[in-house]
Amino acid sequence: MSGTDHEAVSATEARRLFADWKAAPAIVLAVSGGPDSLALMWLAARWRKALKRGPALAVVTVDHGLRPEAAAEARAVKRLAASLDLPHRTLRWSGDKPSTGIQAAARGARYRLLAKAAKTLGASHVMTAHTRDDQAETVLMRLSRGSGIAGLAAMAREIERDGVVLARPLLDVPKARLIATLAKARIAFATDPSNADPRFTRPRLRELMPQLAAEGCDARSLVRLAVRAARADAALELMTDGAEQFLASLDAGSERPGVNARAFLGLAAEIQIRLLLRTLSRHGHEGPPELGKVEALAEALSQAAARRPQAAAKIRLKQTLAGAVISLTGDRLVIVPAPPRRGRVR
């Protein structure tokens, strides 16, 4: 990214930032009224105006119903959108709100509403205003939780979610540059007090960033870690694809369930774990399994195979995880959907 960390984003830079989405039919801009999303709207509008042909832009604000100021902020976004010749609509998160995990629940609701709006408007993409600062904080949060390589890759520039493509054109732009962009354009913005609420993890980690930066662990370094983790994760996913194909080839023409256990356990531990994650996600009915539990499963499979003879019909391990049944029987590793739990209404 050219320019210092406190310079306004130029029109030339904006063209580069948004260039990947020039051919999109329509794009929804997720704008809350805060500095990052207002800068996204301002830059996207200028970029689109400079194109002879390009995507239709529409602005969507989600009011979570959690702050009384949110309605006024949505109206302010609507006024600015109108001045930029952009259509705007406000969507509201209705219904009961959870007493715990409110931020995660609000985030999930926001993405669902944005995806629904995109489909209604015929938009292929939803753009959000995540910045370099957000990416660094995400890496720090995942480091603190002991995430694997995929987790440390943090947010992708593009990812499919809820049937639309979520795009983050500002992911390598410092927040300070977006604030400078608004100052230059004389655009006022709102501040969400929850972004500084110490009850939540992200604001607490944000407070630590200056101290970490003084030790060399600044946003740029954390984002560099995310880039390298993403590169390693992509390579490991390719290796996992190859391993999956290899295991399938061993049983070509056979109707035997599962895979060859000896061949599976001969793979590198990381590839075993990724194959288990894939298969459990495919056959389980309780959502994606926790990485730590899958790591424990891989270790249990290895120990079971090592200590017991491979009698043809001998069950050496059987357990359930994430709504799937895993069994190591003879020389076969089989993962199938678990039966519904007794008393559960389905």
UniProtKB/Swiss-Prot annotation:
<dbReference type="InterPro" id="IPR012094">
    <property type="entry name" value="tRNA_Ile_lys_synt"/>
</dbReference>
<dbReference type="InterPro" id="IPR014729">
    <property type="entry name" value="Rossmann-like_a/b/a_fold"/>
</dbReference>
<dbReference type="GO" id="GO:0005524">
    <property type="term" value="F:ATP binding"/>
</dbReference>
<keyword id="KW-0819">tRNA processing</keyword>
<dbReference type="GO" id="GO:0005737">
    <property type="term" value="C:cytoplasm"/>
</dbReference>
<feature type="binding site">
    <location>
        <begin position="32"/>
        <end position="37"/>
    </location>
    <ligand>
        <name>ATP</name>
    </ligand>
</feature>
<dbReference type="InterPro" id="IPR011063">
    <property type="entry name" value="TilS/TtcA_N"/>
</dbReference>
<comment type="function">
    <text>Ligates lysine onto the cytidine present at position 34 of the AUA codon-specific tRNA(Ile) that contains the anticodon CAU, in an ATP-dependent manner. Cytidine is converted to lysidine, thus changing the amino acid specificity of the tRNA from methionine to isoleucine.</text>
</comment>
<dbReference type="InterPro" id="IPR012795">
    <property type="entry name" value="tRNA_Ile_lys_synt_N"/>
</dbReference>
<comment type="similarity">
    <text>Belongs to the tRNA(Ile)-lysidine synthase family.</text>
</comment>
<dbReference type="Pfam" id="PF01171">
    <property type="entry name" value="ATP_bind_3"/>
</dbReference>
<keyword id="KW-0547">Nucleotide-binding</keyword>
<keyword id="KW-0067">ATP-binding</keyword>
<keyword id="KW-0963">Cytoplasm</keyword>
<dbReference type="GO" id="GO:0006400">
    <property type="term" value="P:tRNA modification"/>
</dbReference>
<protein>
    <recommendedName>
        <fullName>tRNA(Ile)-lysidine synthase</fullName>
        <ecNumber>6.3.4.19</ecNumber>
    </recommendedName>
</protein>
<dbReference type="GO" id="GO:0032267">
    <property type="term" value="F:tRNA(Ile)-lysidine synthase activity"/>
</dbReference>
<keyword id="KW-0436">Ligase</keyword>
